[in-house]
């Protein structure tokens, strides 16, 4: 337990008074986080890795993503951004406001929302190859952490 108490930078004592989460700011910051992550995701997966994704999808006899699927993925990105800023708001009393806490929130979302699914579905099942899995997973890290920083910058209690 000593390790975890060293990581925390909060000056609040356990059971101290915490402010309420500002839901309006969570939504605003979350939408910004989601938009930033979606744009970066397009650059990583659509531009840099687009031909590799298309080749892999063809090998699986799966058509390219439709406009409807792209819209759905972007809506999921917005929902992920809102969840991310909510996590930031929830851990902010313990770690303090700022970039470091936004990075912690981004890492938490990345581990659960990108790393674990990509390891299981892309690597363990061998569907898309390790190279694509590694690149898209590392791209996801950048997308989510940068989105977290942008979204957290708008959050105020």
What are these regions (language model features)?
Residues 4, 12-157:
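Juxtamembrane/disordered regions of integral membrane proteins
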């Amino acid at each position: 337990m000593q390790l975890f108490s060293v990581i925390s930078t909060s000056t609040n004592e356990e059971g101290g008074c915490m402010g309420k989460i500002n839901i309006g700011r969570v939504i605003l910051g979350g939408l910004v986080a989601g938009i930033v992550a979606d744009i970066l995701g397009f650059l990583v997966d659509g531009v840099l890795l687009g031909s590799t994704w298309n080749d892999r999808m063809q090998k699986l006899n799966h058509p390219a993503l439709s406009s409807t699927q792209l819209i759905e993925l972007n809506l999921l990105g917005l929902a992920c951004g809102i969840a991310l800023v909510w996590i930031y708001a929830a851990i902010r009393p313990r770690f303090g406001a700022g970039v470091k806490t936004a990075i912690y929130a981004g890492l938490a979302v990345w581990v659960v929302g990108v790393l674990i699914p990509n390891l299981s579905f892309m690597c363990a099942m061998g569907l898309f190859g390790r190279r694509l899995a590694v690149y898209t997973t590392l791209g996801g890290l950048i997308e989510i952490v940068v989105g977290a920083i942008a979204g957290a910058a708008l959050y105020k209690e």
